[in-house]
Amino acid sequence: MSLKMMERLSTDMDGTRDVASPPARQDAAEPERTVELSGVKEGAAPNSPPRAVPVIELLRRGEGLGNIKAREQELRLQNIRTTELCRATLTPATELCRAPLTPTTELCRAPLTPTTELCRAPLTPTTELCRPPLTPAAEFCRASLTPASELCRAPSSVTGPSLTATTELCRPPIPLPTPSTGPPAEQAVEARMVQLSPTASLPLQAAGRTMLYGLNQPLASDNSGYFGDPDTFPMYTSNSRAKRRPGPIEVEISEGPQPKVVRRIFTNSRERWRQQNVNGAFAELRKLIPTHPPDKKLSKNEILRLAMKYINFLAKLLDDQEEEGNQRNKGNKDNGMVQQELLQDMLSPNSSCGSSLDGAPSPDSYSEEHDALDSKHSRNLHQAMLPIDGSGQR
């Protein structure tokens, strides 16, 4: 009877029973037997699963079929408690998701590459913020844009439109004729190599040149007082203002946003040439003033003062010469009239009985009187020149 019950229990519990441990000794104490029934040994961990008791041991202890089935159900419940929350095996990195995930994708269930932690679509390293993939060469050759529109541009390939040279920030880029033949990369390089040159700049207009200098008015002429014959005096001519000669360097001005700079350059150049003309006129005037050392250094103030004194002296000298000529003519007329009267008196029949030449003056007396007049005039002229000589020796 006992053998049949053992065979029936063994066929019912083939899939669920564990490997039996060696049987305990029958002469063990009663506390040991109660511990074996509960499946926990002394010193074992409290959370460790209880050891399975073999069916033969249960039959030996005299337990019935109902007790064996209850024991079996208890073992199944204990095995279910050992699995924590998920039935599938999970890796330590995927503690919140039941599907197996790679360690780099802790927040998303779809497998992603390590470089794309925020976006699921695969991106290249150059497109960091979810842009369409671009090649490294297309990062600088996109489209002809101004320097202000450097951000937020649409992607373009290398074979796009050639770039224009943005060499001038004040004006829009100038369209340059590019040859139709040749690869597009060479055309882009040629357009990038454009420098600031007269051919690349805007054409010069006549208004810019006339703003600095007159086109038909030189700053000086060949027949001016400074460059002309020293015998002529330009200050007495009708055109007293000296003409200007052209400067050594003419600055060509194109259209630009700097009118103040252009006006300052023009003013400085005009003042420089005016000062040169004034200095040249003073140098010519200094040559005309007689001084005791001929090469004496004089300031502009001294040159002007000596020139005024010299002009006054020359004017007075001309007046004296004119007065002297008038006196000579008057004296000659008076002497002729006196001689005629004397001759008439001498030749007249009513003359005195004495000698005819007693009362008539001799020719020597007329020469002595003329010499006295000449000496008096020379003394007056010498006195007029004395102040000029004293001032010239300073």
Curated annotation (Swiss-Prot):
| UniProt-annotated stretches for the region Disordered | 1-49, 347-394
Compartments where found: Nucleus
* Domain bHLH: start-end pairs: 262-314
Recall the taxonomic lineage recorded for the source organism: Eukaryota, Metazoa, Chordata, Craniata, Vertebrata
Chief location category: nucleus
Which BP terms from GO are recorded?
A: erythrocyte differentiation; hemopoiesis; regulation of transcription by RNA polymerase II
Inducing stimuli: By bmp-signaling in the ventral mesoderm. Inhibition by fgf regulates the timing of hematopoiesis.
The GO cellular component terms are: nucleus
Q: In which tissues is it expressed?
A: First expressed in patches on the ventral side of the embryo in a region that will give rise to hematopoietic tissue. By late neurula stages, expressed throughout the ventral blood island region. By tailbud stages, expression extends to probable vascular progenitor cells, but is excluded from the presumptive liver anlage. Also expressed in the central nervous system at the tailbud stage.
Q: Where are the sequence repeats?
A: 83-89, 94-100, 105-111, 116-122, 127-133, 149-155, 167-173
UniProt xrefs under InterPro entries: bHLH_dom (IPR011598), HLH_DNA-bd_sf (IPR036638), TAL-like (IPR040238)
Keywords, sorted A to Z: Developmental protein, Differentiation, DNA-binding, Nucleus, Repeat, Transcription, Transcription regulation
What is known about what this protein does?
Transcription factor that acts synergistically with lmo2 and gata1 to specify embryonic dorsal mesoderm to a hematopoietic fate.
GO MF annotations in UniProt: DNA-binding transcription factor activity; DNA-binding transcription factor activity, RNA polymerase II-specific; protein dimerization activity; RNA polymerase II cis-regulatory region sequence-specific DNA binding
Top-rank taxon, per record? Eukaryota
Q: Does the keyword Protease apply?
A: no
What spans are recorded as compositionally biased (Basic and acidic residues)? 1-17, 367-377
Name assigned to this protein: T-cell acute lymphocytic leukemia protein 1
